[in-house]
Amino acid sequence: MTTRQSSFNYEEILSCGRGELFGPGNAQLPLPPMLMVHRITDISETGGAFDKGYIRAEYDVRPDDWYFPCHFAGNPIMPGCLGLDGMWQLTGFFLGWLGEPGRGMALSTGEVKFKGMVRPDTKLLEYGIDFKRVMRGRLVLGTADGYLKADGEVIYQASDLRVGLSKDKAA
């Protein structure tokens, strides 16, 4: 059995954004400023809430992050969709880490709950993604539940995050 790397630093995550980590044409994270992950602290193909694998990651919030001045002037808040996108980014990363071929795309999610906000004084975001299943066919499909913590408090939850990997290039 091959032992896979179980954590990734920022430089390794950037290499995924450049298409180097999993090879050309395979799962790729966005590059800054759209990259919503700074570290993957733990990743496993077993365990998690459904015993089908999990990923844990972190993002360091800075008061000068690009979205604060424009969302909203006088009341800076990170857009909730960026936290949700971070969950999709990690779901796709997991599929690439498993060695599955193809380019990633967010497909859907079930219920999303926003219970708090990310403000400039927030220090650390922590992601938790727990896999329910990975289906392998013409399209590789990962389904997971996820959460986002801000300074230790769960503020976002999403069920049935779905990301697919396709060998077709984006149009």
Curated annotation (Swiss-Prot):
GO CC annotations, alphabetized: cytoplasm
Cell compartments where the protein resides: Cytoplasm
Keyword Cell cycle on entry: no
UniProt cross-references to Pfam families, sorted A to Z: FabA (PF07977)
Annotated Gene3D superfamilies: Hotdog Thioesterase
Annotated GO MF terms: (3R)-hydroxyacyl-[acyl-carrier-protein] dehydratase activity; trans-2-decenoyl-acyl-carrier-protein isomerase activity
Cross-referenced SUPFAM superfamilies: Thioesterase/thiol ester dehydrase-isomerase
Transmembrane domains' residue ranges: none
This protein's pathway: Lipid metabolism; fatty acid biosynthesis
Catalytic residues identified in the record: 71
Reaction equations catalysed: a (3R)-hydroxyacyl-[ACP] = a (2E)-enoyl-[ACP] + H2O; (3R)-hydroxydecanoyl-[ACP] = (2E)-decenoyl-[ACP] + H2O; (2E)-decenoyl-[ACP] = (3Z)-decenoyl-[ACP]
The protein's Enzyme Commission number: 4.2.1.59, 5.3.3.14
Gene Ontology biological-process annotations: unsaturated fatty acid biosynthetic process
Keyword match Magnesium: no
Keywords: Cytoplasm, Fatty acid biosynthesis, Fatty acid metabolism, Isomerase, Lipid biosynthesis, Lipid metabolism, Lyase
Family from the record: Belongs to the thioester dehydratase family. FabA subfamily.
Function: Necessary for the introduction of cis unsaturation into fatty acids. Catalyzes the dehydration of (3R)-3-hydroxydecanoyl-ACP to E-(2)-decenoyl-ACP and then its isomerization to Z-(3)-decenoyl-ACP. Can catalyze the dehydratase reaction for beta-hydroxyacyl-ACPs with saturated chain lengths up to 16:0, being most active on intermediate chain length.
UniProt xrefs under NCBIfam families: fabA, PRK05174.1
Summary of subunit composition and partner proteins: Homodimer.
Name the UniProt record assigns to this protein: 3-hydroxydecanoyl-[acyl-carrier-protein] dehydratase
Organism from which the protein derives: Rhizobium rhizogenes (strain K84 / ATCC BAA-868)
